[in-house]
UniProtKB/Swiss-Prot annotation:
Record protein name field: Superoxide dismutase [Mn], mitochondrial
Protein family per UniProt: Belongs to the iron/manganese superoxide dismutase family.
Cofactor note: Binds 1 Mn(2+) ion per subunit.
Principal subcellular localisation of the protein: mitochondrion
MF term (GO), any: manganese ion binding
Amino acid sequence: KHSLPDLPYDYGA
C-alpha cells in the first residue's frame, strides 16, 4: 500500500 502504513516497515509495501 502507498497510503498510511500500519507498520514502520510497511511503507513501500
